């Protein structure tokens, strides 16, 4: 646990803050647009679910990229922190940032009197965890930021057309489907854990 805390301390200031800020801004964009455009509940749900999916990609697609990789190398060399804890600490910190961002968006919806505000906090976080986990896994395997962003974007586009199975759709509330997003959230956590596992065992780029 002390190694994990040290890894988070080393990594937090220089690597994760801008990604978390980008996610927060994207999350808050949907309620603000809904407020200005006088959207219906279903239209607002679609906007929030779309924004949260994009926020997950923004926060996690750059998880393993070169400038952050150099920071990991320095932390491991200087402090003797195990490699996997640095990647895991970064992923956990960004998941926490996504949860806070999702709750902030839900509070903004509630302030507008929206009937879907509480549901959107969990739905938005599940979307962000899934698309972010998918982006991180693509990044770990490919080493390409473009591919890491492209595959979740493709999933997003196909899903928006209604072609994804209901248990894995990003747009449960927008499509008026029953059930919750627990399977989507768990799939996102699994993808993110697999991404950290893969990255830990791949050699650093020179």
Where is each model-derived feature located?
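Hydrophobic alpha-helical transmembrane segments
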Residues: 1-50, 55-67, 129, 137-143, ...
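Selective transmembrane-helix segments that form parts of the transport pathway or gating/packing helices
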Residues: 16, 81-110
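Juxtamembrane "helix-exit" motif on the non-cytosolic side of transmembrane helices
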Residues: 30-39, 105-114, 162-172
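Short alpha-helical transmembrane interface motifs in multi-pass membrane proteins
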Residues: 53-58, 89, 115-120
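Helix-loop-helix units of permease transmembrane domains in multi-pass membrane transporters
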Residues: 62-93
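Residue-level recognition of membrane-helix boundary sites in multi-pass small-molecule transporters
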Residues: 85, 146-147
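Membrane-interfacial helix-loop-helix connectors in multipass membrane proteins
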Residues: 104-130
């Amino acid at each position: 646990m002390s190694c994990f805390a040290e890894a988070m301390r080393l990594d937090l200031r220089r690597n994760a803050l801008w990604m978390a800020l980008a996610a927060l801004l994207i999350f808050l964009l949907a309620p603000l647009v809904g407020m200005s455009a006088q959207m219906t509940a279903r239209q607002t749900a679609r906007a929030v679910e779309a924004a949260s999916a994009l926020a997950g990609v923004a926060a996690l697609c750059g998880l393993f990229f070169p400038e952050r990789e150099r920071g990991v190398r320095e932390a491991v060399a200087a402090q003797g922190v195990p490699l996997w804890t640095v990647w895991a600490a970064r992923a956990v910190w960004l998941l926490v940032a996504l949860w806070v961002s999702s709750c902030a968006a839900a509070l903004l919806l509630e302030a507008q009197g929206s009937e879907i505000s509480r549901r959107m906090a969990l739905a938005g976080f599940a979307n962000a965890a899934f698309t972010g986990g998918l982006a991180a896994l693509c990044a770990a395997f490919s080493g390409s930021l473009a591919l890491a962003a492209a595959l979740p974007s493709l999933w997003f586009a196909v899903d928006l057309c209604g072609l994804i199975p209901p248990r894995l759709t990003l747009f449960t509330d927008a499509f008026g489907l029953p059930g919750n997003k627990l399977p989507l959230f768990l799939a996102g956590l699994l993808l993110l854990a697999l991404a950290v596992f893969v990255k830990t065992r791949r050699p650093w780029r020179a």
